[in-house]
Amino acid sequence: MKNIIFMGPPGAGKGTQAKILCARLSIPQISTGDILREAVKNQTPMGIEAKRYMDAGDLVPDSVVIGIIKDRIREADCKNGFLLDGFPRTVEQADALDALLKNEGKSIDKAINLEVPDGELLKRLLGRAEIEGRADDNEATIKNRLDNYNKKTLPLLDFYAAQKKLSQVNGVGTLEEVTSLIQRELV
């Protein structure tokens, strides 16, 4: 079984690499960002609540995100593993995830962190905003998201390193180069 976490700052390529890896491993990609954006688009109660935070570049409250994850990992397609993309983002969320998985008889096997310099991230995200028209990808919001990441998410590296589950991967390179580096860490 492969239960994998993809970590890295916004724009590091987590979503792109997750799609490739999930297809190769035949496991589902669980993207909290995609689930939240869909809820916002459909104006569900959770989506309306989440939108306020997302528009400001702030993290959506743990209670909302944990509930989403709990429901999702119980689905049949997660029986043989899953890849979490964009969660956990804080040590508190990681603790809650570990407790949730333990109750389900599961655990995280590997946490992969994609490392990309801030200047490259800003360039990628501004380019994505133009191509995809994502409202949450303007320069002020991007800088706030990177600041949030640096303050709240970076401590997760120590959390998973202490569990001997962390792999650091250079996220700068061609799609194929980065994919190859990630696959080496999963052997």
Curated annotation (Swiss-Prot):
User: What superkingdom heads the lineage?
Assistant: Bacteria
Put simply, this protein is called: Adenylate kinase
- PROSITE patterns xrefs: ADENYLATE_KINASE
Q: Pathway of this protein?
A: Purine metabolism; AMP biosynthesis via salvage pathway; AMP from ADP: step 1/1
In this chain, ATP is annotated as bound at G11, A12, G13, K14, G15, T16, R128, G173
Q: Which GO MF term does the entry hold, naming one?
A: adenylate kinase activity
Its biological function?
Catalyzes the reversible transfer of the terminal phosphate group between ATP and AMP. Plays an important role in cellular energy homeostasis and in adenine nucleotide metabolism.
What does the UniProt entry say about where the protein is found?
Answer: Cytoplasm
Task: Enumerate the residues binding AMP.
Answer: T32, R37, D58, L59, V60, G86, F87, P88, R89, Q93, R134, R145
Which source organism does the UniProt entry give?
A: Leptospira borgpetersenii serovar Hardjo-bovis (strain JB197)
